[in-house]
Curated annotation (Swiss-Prot):
Family matches, as NCBIfam families: PabB-fungal (TIGR01823), trpG_papA (TIGR00566)
Record's protein name: Putative aminodeoxychorismate synthase
Species per Swiss-Prot/TrEMBL record: Schizosaccharomyces pombe (strain 972 / ATCC 24843)
UniProt pathway: Cofactor biosynthesis; tetrahydrofolate biosynthesis; 4-aminobenzoate from chorismate: step 1/2
EC annotation from Swiss-Prot or TrEMBL: 2.6.1.85
Any single biological process term in GO: folic acid biosynthetic process
Catalyses which reaction(s): chorismate + L-glutamine = 4-amino-4-deoxychorismate + L-glutamate
Family of this protein: In the C-terminal section; belongs to the anthranilate synthase component I family.
Cross-referenced Pfam families: Anth_synt_I_N, Chorismate_bind, GATase
Region (PABB component): 266-718
Keyword rRNA processing: no
Recorded GO CC terms: cytoplasm; cytosol; nucleus
Amino acid sequence: MSEISNRLQILLIDCYDSYTFNLYDLLYKASENACVIVVHWDKMSPDLWEDILQFDAIVVGPGPGHPAEYSSILNRIWQLNIPVMGICLGFQSLALYHGATIERMPNLPWHGRVSSVTTSKTFIFDGISAVKGMRYHSLYANKIPIDSLQILAQSDEDNIVMSIKATKFPHFGILYHPESVGSSKSLKIFKNFLSLADTPNIQCVNSFSKSANGFSHNLNRYDISPAAFILKSGSPSLQIHSVEIPWVEPLALADCIQKSGNPICFLDSAKKPGRYSILGILTGPLARIIHYEKATNTTEIRICKDNSFVRINNDLWSTVADFMNQHKAIKPDTNLPFYGGIMGIIGYECSDLSTKSVSNASFPLDFQQTTVDAELAFVDRSFVFDLEIKKLFVQTLTPLNETCSEWWGELLASTCNTKLDNLSCLHSFDGKQNFGLVQSFPKKEVYCESVKACQEHLLAGDSYEMCLTDTTFVSAPPELSDFEMYMRARSLNPATFAGFVRLNHFTLLCCSPERFLQFRDDRCLFSPIKGTLKREGHMSLEEARKKLLNEKDMGELNMIIDLIRNDLHQLAKKNSVHVPELYSVEEHSNVYSLLSNIYGRIESPITAWDVLSKSFPPGSMTGAPKLRSVRMLEPLEQHGRGIYSGTLGYWDVTGSAEFNVIIRSAFKYKADDYWRIGAGGAVTILSSPEGEYEEMVLKANSILPAFVNLKNKKRSCK
């Protein structure tokens, strides 16, 4: 046989889980000659069933809910005499098929917690006596029939069956998640499993022609593995002009420019380790504003210089990908993060996962529209501040071979007629100035009931973690400008990923400490935060670390680490996703945070935008599995999140990108006379309703003092 015809063909069944592509990666690591296609469990067409015996092995992935929900499809899998591995839900489905009962855990579910597992040292555990297994399950298999199922592994802590094998067929199940970053010896387990399928399926291997990737042409059409938006990269159409000019304080320049009332995007590294601040303005001939209304699936691109526009009946993600493919530039020798390109926000609901939209479908998408689901600017003129070495660069994008005028000199002369380092907006906020009022704050009893509702979903196996949020509505003192309100918030809560953004339909005051995604060259980085501790007294960083490294907070972060690994594995180069350090603790002005860093390599034609779209909304703001969690949260949250829980950042014309998670922030839409402040936390099975409410209050209070005097009991958020 040829090399291609000898490649193992593996079917991976996705049950709409957020860890499926971690299994995808593990399968490729376990067999260099594997070819894996991924299908949704409920999209297995009659044609696929006719081709099913082409596969040398099948893996049934994890998923939410009870396995009985999937029996109409998965029971047919258990009738096949080919190697099959079921993970978590797949394990439960195999056990249920053979007559076991699937019940709720006798004590609490295990979500994001590592268990010690003792094995039989046989079959898939050949050569393995014990493993560490990351457990994400609310249900377990009881009354296992020993005549049809053999027990291969059990947990040491609670004696729960962790692995089984069918006695008559090469069918295996593992209840814990071997694909998790917290599980051990998983590569050996999967190598043992795939050794059963090492000889291609002789029933059909000669019946179908193979394509270059090892699949028959029949099988290729079933694969749901994501691809890049743009498969052929466009040629550069722009050139970059970058000039160093004398240093100006970024806050002072931002204040001068924003006073014109024109759109502005200011990404403010208000705290180390942030090194660069970026100020984008929309006065150039190439400047555009792009906004998206999900309710009508319409994207508008408006030319700033003459206010003309085009409306495109397509989603934001595809439209922006196509736009940026036509607006590319070759990176110069300087090593700056941004030279021009897309800046702005993408709201939480701006994905297919959410059924909601904050845009109003009853109005056409124009300047009268008060809310949009996303709004971005294409910035052709920008300032980049290197805060570490106090250097300022001014950037201009022009069409190829066009010269660049010194537009910044006129701008600075006309707008900055006040001494830049002596502006009132730079003075620290001391809490003695005027305040606004809280218009509405989440009621404790309502929020606590929502926490309990989340936990019922967790007990039922529908989710491992649900990130519940709510919204506070607050007014600002009328005599203060939006930028002055930003300066208040920044003074109280300086953050690495802060920003002030005002576009046609919204204003955002952002004090976020959390990076969502960073993309440099071919390297991608995610930095989720889970676990928040209030700074009190003289608490040291080491003391905070000891308190944050508890079972609940580590469990929350474990779930999101694995979720982000899954998102990256969809597009990253094989074997490139890694987590050098599972847990880190960062110090902020009001709180300590537990976080992790997840890395991966991305190869052309895949872009930062592709990775962003496949990982949006941020997993740290949804829970896991992401789809089921988002849908279950929607009826529990009284208001659409809008900009909160979305992302603010940039995608540069050279391909670089960085986006935050919009938390610790306030925003208002164009027609609003009030501000919205979102806050919440990850509900796990170890949460207490009162504790979750207090965490939500703590996070809201990171931004509320800029608006409200919390020392005045009548105005207190509690």
